[in-house]
Curated annotation (Swiss-Prot):
This is Protein GrpE. Keywords: Chaperone, Cytoplasm, Stress response. GO terms for cellular component: cytosol. One of its GO terms (molecular function) is protein-folding chaperone binding. The gene is grpE. Its main location: cytoplasm. Homodimer. Participates actively in the response to hyperosmotic and heat shock by preventing the aggregation of stress-denatured proteins, in association with DnaK and GrpE. It is the nucleotide exchange factor for DnaK and may function as a thermosensor. Unfolded proteins bind initially to DnaJ; upon interaction with the DnaJ-bound protein, DnaK hydrolyzes its bound ATP, resulting in the formation of a stable complex. GrpE releases ADP from DnaK; ATP binding to DnaK triggers the release of the substrate protein, thus completing the reaction cycle. NCBIfam families: PRK14139.1 (NF010737), PRK14140.1 (NF010738), PRK14150.1 (NF010748). One of its GO terms (biological process) is protein folding. InterPro entries: GrpE, GrpE_coiled_coil, GrpE_head. Belongs to the GrpE family. SUPFAM superfamilies: Coiled-coil domain of nucleotide exchange factor GrpE, Head domain of nucleotide exchange factor GrpE. Signal peptide: none annotated.
C-alpha cells in the first residue's frame, strides 16, 4: 500500500470517527438536552414536593374539620341535656308548693273525725303517688333530722341549745328540701342544735 492509499484510509477512518462523534453542534445539543432534562426532573421533583405538602395540609384540614364537627356535636348534646335538666328543674321547683300543701293538709287534718279520716287517707295516697312519680325523674327529698348540718343542703332558721342532740345536728325540719339529680333545688329549712 502506498502513501496515498494510506492517507485515504486514514481520512476515511477520521471521517468515520467524526461522524460517530458528531459535530461540535451535536455535542452542544446533547449537553443542552441533558441540562434540559435535569431542569425538567428538578421541576417535576419540586412539583411533587409541593403536591405532597398540599396533600398533607388538606389531610390536616380534614382532620381538624372532623374534630370540630365532633366538638360541635358534643356541645350540642351537652346543651340539649342542660336544657332538659333546666326545664325539669324548673318544673320540679313549681311542684314543690303542691307537695308542701298536701303535707300541711295531712298535718292539720282532724284524724279523729271519720269523714275527715277518709279524706286524709285520699290526700296521703295522692301525696305518696305524687312523690313516687317525681322520684322516677330524679327528684329526692332532703329530710335531715338527726344529721349533721350541711350548708349546701340545709338552711338554718335558727340554733337552739339541746341536751338531747350533739352540737351542729339538725333537730327539727321546718320545711323539707329537695334535690334533682343531686343538685339542690330547695334546701331544707332546719333548726340546728348548739
Amino acid at each position: 500500500m502506498n502513501n496515498e492509499e494510506k492517507k485515504v484510509n486514514e481520512e476515511i477512518v477520521v471521517e468515520d470517527q467524526i461522524e460517530a462523534i458528531g459535530t461540535e453542534a451535536d455535542v452542544e445539543w446533547n449537553e443542552s438536552m441533558e441540562e434540559s432534562q435535569d431542569a425538567k426532573i428538578a421541576e417535576l421533583e419540586a412539583a411533587l414536593l409541593a403536591s405532597q405538602a398540599q396533600l398533607k395540609e388538606q389531610q390536616d384540614a380534614v382532620l381538624r374539620a372532623k374534630a370540630e364537627e365532633q366538638n360541635v356535636r358534643r356541645r350540642a348534646e351537652g346543651d340539649i341535656d342542660k336544657a332538659r335538666k333546666y326545664a325539669l328543674k324548673k318544673f320540679a321547683g313549681e311542684l314543690l308548693p303542691v307537695i308542701d300543701n298536701l303535707e300541711r293538709a295531712l298535718e292539720s287534718g282532724d284524724k279523729e273525725n271519720e269523714a275527715a279520716k277518709v279524706l286524709l287517707e285520699g290526700v296521703e295516697l295522692t301525696l305518696q303517688t305524687f312523690i313516687s312519680t317525681i322520684e322516677k325523674f330524679g327528684l329526692t327529698v332532703i329530710n335531715p333530722v338527726g344529721e349533721t348540718f350541711n350548708p349546701e343542703h340545709h338552711q338554718a332558721i335558727g340554733m337552739q341549745a339541746s341536751p338531747d342532740h350533739e352540737s351542729n345536728t339538725v333537730m327539727v325540719v321546718m320545711q323539707k328540701g329537695y334535690s334533682l339529680n343531686e343538685q339542690v333545688i330547695r334546701p331544707a329549712m332546719v333548726m340546728v342544735a348548739q
